[in-house]
Amino acid sequence: MRGFAAVLMGAALCFAHPCIAQMGPPDANPVPGMPGFAGPLAAKYGVDAAKILEAAETDEDGYAALTYLCDHVGKRLSGTPQLNTAVAWGAELMRKAGLQNVTVQPVMVPRWVRGSESAAMMYKGEAGPITRPLHMLGLGMSVGTPAGGITAPVVFVSTFDALDAMTPDEVKGKIVVFNPGWHGYGVNTQYRTFGASRVAAKGAVAMLVRSATGLAMQIPHTGTLVYDAKQPKIPAAAISVEDALMIERLCKEGPVTVHLQMDAHMDADVQAGNVMGEIVGSEHPEQVVSIGGHLDSWDVGQGAQDDGSGIMAAYEAVTLIHKLGLKPKRTIRLVFWVNEENGGAGGRAYRKMIGDKIGEQVAAIEMDEGAEKPLGMGYGSAGGPRRPRTPAAGAQSADASALSPQIQQSLAAMQDIVSLLGPIGANTVTPGGGGSDIEPLTADGVPALSPRTTGAHYFDWHHTEADTLDKVDPVEFRKNAAMLSVVTYVLADMDGRLAGRKSGGQ
């Protein structure tokens, strides 16, 4: 990377120093997903970007902090002592790094307790009845079963449409097992999130759902659910891909029964806190670029990719700027939000703290997709999905010309900025992006951004016992940090601002 940085620095010196009003070619009409083009921002910030890329190549502080977080704090579910340990540790980490105005914003978070849990299916075998344990994880915020568990016949359902076509008599008193296949996280999580109440409306006593992953390794993936207040709360759990497929096969042959036991329950809310530290702006300290991820995790694995890698890459991004002595005009605020996984209380509290000063929020950057090989940045205010997904066959790319002139100009500015990231292969920008923690900001018009990575394995480990430090490659981690650092610094220092749009508007 160092050689590329030197080339970039030399090329930058050949450019003039134009103003931000000329953010791209006069007829620029950015095409979503296309590589960036070098323009006035690349000319102005090429030297500083090269310094950041070179420093990031050898900086080990971020990965060292991630290692400590994973190995010495561990899983960090909201409401647990481990999360509050992480909050205190995170604040001290920022102080030692020399960030200013380090504070912990109090946030009340839910306390969901998993307790003991198990599941087994019973069906007819060649030599007699077979009882086979299921690989399961209760879904976050689920209620538990009655004492002794629930034993009930299974009804297999592939989709919500198939469920809607069933009569209540076909579902009442049964355990519904969903296996919609794998169509990407956004599709599959609809079943995990809303399936329990959908089947409860027809009288089901519990729900099991195929884990939201395309990888079959007998590993269940947890995640949160949301109950419909109008329906009874029934217990719900995720099962492995293999178990879901086997139940589907067996249900075609004859009766299948499942015994489900879950001690899950809610305790009283617990105080935690968003951790914040800043590089105060040299000219416009009241204007803020927020960058971060979520400090909490599920109660399985180490929360390494989700989202330890995100917060520590953001930490390294900000501290690189500080170490290099760069002085952005605006304030850069590093935020470790809490309770992203099962409530979103941290993001809402952060928005409430900002209050009527929302217009001073210049941009919000959230990293919550893992730290695999970086490809570039997503610009959520230009529309598109939060998470990148493969388009359907024959689908047409979004027409950038349909966007407002302000959004088009901002897309051009982002293409200009990401052109600085060519040395690490992260020089693309796509419409889409954002995150749960910054959604309360972006809903009120703050420009939303998030890293785009290959994401080749993220959902193999996501919300499982396998989300451990060894899944985070140190080289790719540093590239992500470098990408975030360059983008954050330019957004905090450039003369103009990206355009945002409120929810439902352009």
What are these regions (language model features)?
Residues 5-18:
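Bacterial N-terminal signal peptides
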Residues 24-45, 67, 71-175, 181-182:
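Noncatalytic luminal/extracellular "stalk/propeptide" segments of secretory-pathway proteins
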Residues 39-80, 217-224, 296, 368-372, ...:
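N-terminal capping segment at the start of a domain
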Residues 46-48, 124-125, 136-168, 225-304, ...:
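Soluble metallo-hydrolase cores and metallopeptidase-like ectodomains found primarily
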Residues 49-57, 71-82, 118, 141, ...:
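Second-shell loop/turn segments in exported
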Residues 64, 72, 319-345:
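Short helix-loop-beta-strand segments that form the rim/entrance of peptidase-like active sites
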Residues 234-239, 244, 251, 284, ...:
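Metal-dependent peptidase/peptidase-like ectodomains
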Residues 319, 323, 459-506:
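His/Asp/Glu-rich mid-to-C-terminal helical/loop segments that flank catalytic regions of hydrolases
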